[in-house]
Amino acid sequence: MRYKPLLLALMLVFSTPAVAAHDAAHNRSAEVKKQTKNKKEQPEAAEGKKEKGKNGAVKDKKTGGKEAAKEGKESKKTAKNRKEAEKEATSRQSARKGREGDKKSKAEHKKAHGKPVSGSKEKNAKTQPENKQGKKEAKGQGNPRKGGKAEKDTVSANKKVRSDKNGKAVKQDKKYREEKNAKTDSDELKAAVAAATNDVENKKALLKQSEGMLLHVSNSLKQLQEERIRQERIRQARGNLASVNRKQREAWDKFQKLNTELNRLKTEVAATKAQISRFVSGNYKNSQPNAVALFLKNAEPGQKNRFLRYTRYVNASNREVVKDLEKQQKALAVQEQKINNELARLKKIQANVQSLLKKQGVTDAAEQTESRRQNAKIAKDARKLLEQKGNEQQLNKLLSNLEKKKAEHRIQDAEAKRKLAEARLAAAEKARKEAAQQKAEARRAEMSNLTAEDRNIQAPSVMGIGSADGFSRMQGRLKKPVDGVPTGLFGQNRSGGDIWKGVFYSTAPATVESIAPGTVSYADELDGYGKVVVVDHGENYISIYAGLSEISVGKGYMVAAGSKIGSSGSLPDGEEGLYLQIRYQGQVLNPSSWIR
């Protein structure tokens, strides 16, 4: 229905020339008929005029004959009167005049009925009035009876001549009119046939034009229908593409959130593992039940109760840490499954987008532009994520290699120490065996007064972890490596979907110092981190300083707490400042719990 006004307009536009052509043909036909009628009427009018002229001439001739007869009667009356007058005067004179009149009348009568000299109808017509006048005079002068008869004969003869002439003229005129009418009818018939032929040709042309116009309108209607269907398909495709773009954007946002949460969980798991490792290592190294037993035996009751409560609290905390680790690992597995599902859904949506783009076939649609922009953004973010993961893996690989080298050195040192210890042990073995029995007897005497609970308790992991000046004893007391503002905290979101696995200090270029004593194990550039310095603080603790503009130390350097190791700069992503990480056995720790 939306194209009905357009169709009516098209039909009106195309039908106007056809109607005009039909009217023109009809007008031409009427004009031809009118001209034919005028041609027919003109000869008839001319014939009418001619016939009227002829009839007038005949009528004039008849009128002239009547007038001549009337004059004859009058002359007859006059002659009679004159005759009576002459009779009254003298009989002789009238007789003599009568004879002379008879002679004269006969001569005139003979002359009047004689052969005409010229034979011209017009001359005879002209002499007729004279003959009539002579006859009148003869009748008046001669014998009145004979003169009247002659006059009547003359009039009758003239009438007959005139009648014959008029009959011939009428016949000729009738024949002429018939021939002319026949010719006129033939011309009219030819004109009518020509007009009819022209009318038929015009109608054929009009019919052909109407058929062409109908075909054109049909094609136009078909094209409009096809265009409407195409536009409807484009509209549906655009709607579908817009919906898919929205789903793709939502899926990508959800994926980024899930990935960020996954990274956060991984970081927490790593920190928890590091904490558990520290506890286990501390318990293994510093497990001294005999010393604790001696302390509990000799301690006052108040000190003993406080120590036991503290020890139970620490052990309970350690158990909670282990439980948290189990929960985090389960959540991590669930999060990884969600991410895998979201990635599969995202790939399916992207395939659907590509299919819709191919089917739609429109290059100037805003939805396609948005889809291409969105795909480009997703690809860019994905590349950034891959780069960050690659950089993280590269850093972990570097630290792993450093740890391997360090372990090799430790093995070598341990082997040397073992050999030295074996030599010393061989020398002191005898003395040690002799003193062993004495020490055992002394311990049995000391343990006789302890309860079973006192004998089973162990020292808490926080007691005696490392040496008194070790890195583990400095937690919460370390100084900031640079004078800056911490803007990227541990576990917070980072641009590109990653999270901070340390602390980022925003600052202009400034001096960077070591947070604790140690040995420089790496000082060079690293992809994704810029210039990097790694300091080994012993006991499997290391600190990492990334984003340096310059490095002031080299591999193998011994540094103290507060020693300058370089100057801050910016990370490859553009963040200006210093990025600090603290790790234990390769697992990240939260620097905020170590820096005061």
Curated annotation (Swiss-Prot):
Gene3D superfamilies documented for this protein: Glucose Permease (Domain IIA)
Region (Disordered): 25-184
Pfam families named among the record's database cross-references: Peptidase_M23 (PF01551)
One MF term in the entry's GO annotations: metalloendopeptidase activity
Protein name stated in the entry: Uncharacterized protein NMB1333
UniProt feature coiled coil, ranges: 177-281, 318-454
Keywords assigned: Coiled coil, Signal
Family recorded in the similarity comment: Belongs to the peptidase M23B family.
Record field: compositional bias (Basic and acidic residues): 25-90, 161-184
Other facts noted in the record for this chain: Present in outer membrane vesicle formulations which are used as vaccines in human.
Signal peptide: 1-20
Highest taxon in the source lineage: Bacteria
InterPro entries the UniProt entry points to: Cell_wall_metabolism_enzyme, Dup_hybrid_motif, Peptidase_M23
Keyword Plastid recorded: no
